[in-house]
Amino acid sequence: MSKSAVSPMMQQYLGIKAQHTDKLVFYRMGDFYEMFFDDAVEAAKLLDITLTTRGQVDGEPVKMAGVPFHAAEQYLARLVKLGKSVAICEQVGEVGAGKGPVERKVVRIVTPGTLTDSALLEDKETNRIVAVSPDKKYIGLAWASLQSGEFKTKLTTVDKLDDELARLQAAEILLPDSKNAPQLQTASGVTRLNAWQFAADAGEKLLTEYFGCQDLRGFGLDGKEHAVAIGAAGALLNYIRLTQNLMPQHLDGLSLETDSQYIGMDAATRRNLEITQTLSGKKSPTLMSTLDLCATHMGSRLLALWLHHPLRNRAHIRARQEAVAALESQYKPLQCRLKNIADIERIAARIAVGNARPRDLASLRDSLFELAQIDLSANGSSLLETLKAVFPENLSTAEQLRQAILPEPSVWLKDGNVINHGFHPELDELRRIQNHGDEFLLDLEAKERERTGLSTLKVEFNRVHGFYIELSKTQAEQAPADYQRRQTLKNAERFITPELKAFEDKVLTAQEQALALEKQLFDGVLKNLQTALPQLQKAAKAAAALDVLSTFSALAKERNFVRPEFADYPVIHIENGRHPVVEQQVRHFTANHTDLDHKHRLMLLTGPNMGGKSTYMRQVALIVLLAHTGCFVPADAATIGPIDQIFTRIGASDDLASNRSTFMVEMSETAYILHHATEQSLVLMDEVGRGTSTFDGLALAHAVAEHLLQKNKSFSLFATHYFELTYLPEAHAAAVNMHLSALEQGQDIVFLHQIQPGPAGKSYGIAVAKLAGLPVRALKSAQKHLNGLENQAAANRPQLDIFSTMPSEKGDEPNVGNFVDKAEEKHFEGILAAALEKLDPDSLTPREALSELYRLKDLCKSVS
């Protein structure tokens, strides 16, 4: 379109939009933010607002949509949650100051990963932005949180990239717009940048300038292998600078993270353990929602961080444990005090980027004074000593804020009444002029009545006409000569005098001057606080850590969590362990033991559907995870050896986006585990092979279990419905059979949820179907077919020798077919043993005993 065909205002808009083609532009016009053309169409659809038109361009109506500026935050929040970025274009010039449209410019860019405004953020979630820079060997990751000042980098590989992004829970991902950019499982929140922005040389130059250092060796970034990490960090820092229109001063150094710091968990494991999100995508009931007794939002965010980053450093874990133990008698008063603490972390972030509001500073002041009053007995905990020593360091900042900010300032700076009385003499004088105007008006009214003798004379004010003297119609003709007529009404006349006009000018000027001076003083306070940011961030981190540690103490005291012990040898020993989430959802929870060590590394878990196998396996993993956060655990006792990773393969569904079936997803997750699990890993495998035919599934389950035993040698909980696998302990001493017990009462079943030695006798599938409400007709049909299949299997057992033709890895190694036969023999022996177990010889009559003998003989025939 030609510029001559559009208005000057539209020319201005198009020029701004050309610089932000990948973003929605909120263009300020009076009391609205307007959007035009395609932006208007998209915004109308996403925000459910009216799409209209304004004028024409090249003969076509210009589509337009808008939102009120005072409600913009709620609309921005919705757009950000949808992964959209928005350029905020404000009026920065005076209306009517010159020819053409009022001057406008983009003052900030709101993106999903660079939010600082509390209205746009979830209180209990950390908002991170991640930059991804690939090369042939490594992928460099850099991530930051503008709310906390976190700034870290790491080297990873393509196969672990999605797991890292799942761990970081990135709100926005920066990728180079190049052919070698990695393909991500998620497409939401992805921002493409020119590939040159990820250049290592440019990144190092920007980073060294920002941190004021000669090189990045002090951050652990040295050598060519770190080039992609440096490039990612540089691209990220530059992106933050561009979106915020300034270089943030609160990023807390740059640290290089390694795999050895935390227990590894892939995306599937985090999902299956439901750490912060249920399998259905809800926030509750999860491990996080169940444990979160934190008094502050900072504490809740740190708790989520600790749960997703279980430590491997035993010294750091023990330091947390000692603090938890020391707080056991102090956590209640501590949490009561912490409830009065504002979100210092996010207030500090808003100070850093220059958009803190008056009440942010008031809340910060009150919180710093409150923290300084925390009095704890460290009881030998060095961590508590360190944390509580931080708070007095901020008293000088709190005192500066007490002097500068009113006890209860206005919400918005533009409304005035923010700076405290006595802070600045000129502001006090301007306020005196405004606040004592009523006295002047009363004095003037009394003086003028006495001078003129006019009884109806009143001195008043309104926003349209300012100050005026009002006389009734009957007395208006007697007005003195120095009264200048200002307005005529039906029953009155309004006048102005030189004295009143001078006062009006003084008051209105004082108001404008006071607002301008308050803004200047407030900006000065914010600027002075920049130097205090490191100490404020330390206080925020210390308060959050105290909050989480006191929460751990509350859990230990109120939910009977115990302090786990750590061993240097391979062991997972748990006495009467409980699932921390499930036990809060049910009236009675059955506790269970777990014993894995160098002799028994794989627990083969069988039992009925709904018997509790998946719950038990998750329970073990969650207890191990919690122990490594420093939290006490739901058990009577626990001893845990070295753990490097936790893997889970529990349940699966079709991945339609990647065109992968349920079975393909299952096999992909299984393959990942077999390739990455080590002797120090904990592996949970549930129903491997169930997504294919019986023989295929059995063969795969056998192979996977054997691989875990012989190659990975991991601690493994292997749940299966293939009873044929219960032979494994005969061939592998490191495997042990355990089962979830159930009790049959007639045609009904009671699940005991108790772990017991040995394999299960049966699966009780039809009994579970009955509990699920299947029609009686269908249940009878199922039972009939089951009986037929069992009889057929018994009559045709040699057919199972199909497996005997399978080559084994070693000549002397038993093959699957032989194990199937042996497993069936054990299964039938179990049936006979169960039948005998039910008999009570002392209570049988001779006739009943003879009848039972014939029944047992028939049973032997059916299983032989």
Curated annotation (Swiss-Prot):
Gene3D superfamilies linked: 1.10.1420.10, 6.10.140.430, DNA repair protein MutS, domain I (3.40.1170.10), MutS, connector domain (3.30.420.110), P-loop containing nucleotide triphosphate hydrolases (3.40.50.300)
GO terms assigned for molecular function: ATP binding; ATP-dependent DNA damage sensor activity; damaged DNA binding; mismatched DNA binding
Domain of life assignment: Bacteria
GO terms for biological process, alphabetical: mismatch repair
Record key words, sorted: ATP-binding, DNA damage, DNA repair, DNA-binding, Nucleotide-binding
Family as reported in the entry's similarity comment: Belongs to the DNA mismatch repair MutS family.
PANTHER family: DNA MISMATCH REPAIR PROTEIN MSH1, MITOCHONDRIAL, DNA MISMATCH REPAIR PROTEIN MUTS FAMILY MEMBER
Protein name: DNA mismatch repair protein MutS
Native species: Neisseria meningitidis serogroup C / serotype 2a (strain ATCC 700532 / DSM 15464 / FAM18)
